Regions:
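Catalytic core of Fe(II)/2-oxoglutarate
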Residues: 244-246
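Beta-rich carbohydrate-recognition and catalytic domains
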Residues: 1-29, 33, 37-95, 104-157, ...
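C-terminal structured domain segments
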Residues: 312-315, 319-322
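Glycine-rich phosphate-binding loop
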Residues: 101
Length: 361
């Protein structure tokens, strides 16, 4: 385990909108919050959440065309559509397959997708697998109950690409998740004062869950059965005081596991709370990711552009996809105001500059 980082600098350049609704019924309420991954051929695939009328979500399949600096995305259909019982509801309010993240896991030699199913039991994390990134097979819902872990509404599943050590020392595959408070899902904005009055550790916090690697290698179905889970990002910093959630799949850099996460602030405006979704950097220890080496003391990406300020849900940047271009240079794909998909180019400072000094965003 290495020491905490006192400073970590990055530059962020907005590159604009890369995908927006095409006018068809399946996208009338937005395209947003995409996964992305380089498949074995080197092609970049992106998996947008496509939202039809009534908040019915599907996971699209698109392929990048053009140059790295100016990609366009060709629609190829859908990776997953809501047809399982845990994805289908008969009451108003929406249903479907939401907010995917995709990670290639070499030890499994497979692409692993985690997404949120919005069905009769509420939001649940589902895992799907693919050999090529094009054709996906559902493994099923994550079973947190099997080992007495938090059970209920849960979102923001994101897998780490390599085995790590759990808090107990078990070599494991790991994934982010974010259990939700029942009053949050039932009462919406009305629950915000109650949530903010709670101790930060009791608000909606990002956790890492761990699945013993040996059990998964014995039976891939065990990927759904985590044995440990621990809080890694409580909403206890200078920003994002309402809740935090996992964002992009972690990427190995010299300092640790690098990821962008989202966090939410709520401000009372004339008796109604206005929420802002921003993004920050987190770096986890490479061997024991429950140890956080660095966390942004200010957002690195906040809603500023009109496409981020005004949409289906105003004031939202929601990073979910990352494409590694070269060492310490990434394209990050994110949902803008729950309506469109945008891209930023992020470049991390050289390793030497991240060793000491004042904390930076």
């Amino acid at each position: 385990m290495e020491s905490a980082l006192a400073r970590f600098d990055a530059t962020v350049q907005r590159k604009g909108i890369v995908l927006q609704p095409d006018g068809t019924p399946d996208e009338v309420e937005g395209v947003l919050n995409p996964a992305c991954v380089r498949v074995r051929s080197g092609e970049l695939l992106m998996y947008p959440r496509c939202v039809a009328a009534g908040n019915v979500s599907r996971i699209g399949l698109t392929r990048a065309r053009g140059s790295v600096d100016d990609p366009s995305f060709e629609r190829l259909g859908y990776a997953l559509q809501p047809d399982m019982p845990y994805e289908v509801r008969t009451v108003p309010g929406g249903m479907g397959c939401e907010d995917p993240r995709v990670t290639f896991v070499p030890v499994l030699d497979r692409f692993v997708m985690a997404y949120t199913a919005f069905g009769p039991d509420g939001p649940r994390i589902i895992v799907a697998l693919s050999d090529d990134g094009y054709t996906w097979t559902r493994l099923g819902p994550v079973d947190f109950a099997a080992h007495g872990l938090p059970v209920g509404d849960d979102k923001d599943g994101v897998f780490f690409p390599e085995p790590v050590r759990s808090p107990s020392g078990m070599l494991s595959l790991a994934f982010y998740h974010r259990p939700m408070k029942k009053l949050s899902t039932m009462n919406g904005h009305a629950a915000i004062p109650t949530l903010l009055a709670m101790p930060a550790i009791d608000r909606e916090s990002t956790r890492i869950a761990y699945v013993p690697l040996a059990s998964v290698q014995a039976d891939i179905a065990n990927l759904l059965v985590p044995t440990e889970s621990t809080i890694v990002l409580a909403p206890d910093g200078a920003w994002g005081r309402l809740k935090t959630g996992g964002g992009t799949p972690p990427v190995r850099i010299a300092e640790g596991w690098f990821s962008l996460y989202h966090a939410v602030d709520a401000v009372d405006v004339g008796g109604r709370y206005a929420m802002t979704y921003s993004a920050g950097i987190v770096i986890h220890d490479l061997e024991q990711p429950h140890i956080v080496r660095y966390r942004s003391n200010a957002p690195v990406l906040t809603p500023e552009h009109p496409d981020e300020l005004h949409g289906v849900v105003n004031n939202v940047v929601f990073p979910t996809g990352i494409d590694v271009l070269e060492d310490r240079v990434f394209d990050v794909y994110y949902g803008a105001a729950d309506a469109k998909i945008a891209r930023v180019r992020m470049e991390l400072a050289p390793v030497a500059a991240a060793a000491a000094g004042e904390t930076a965003a």
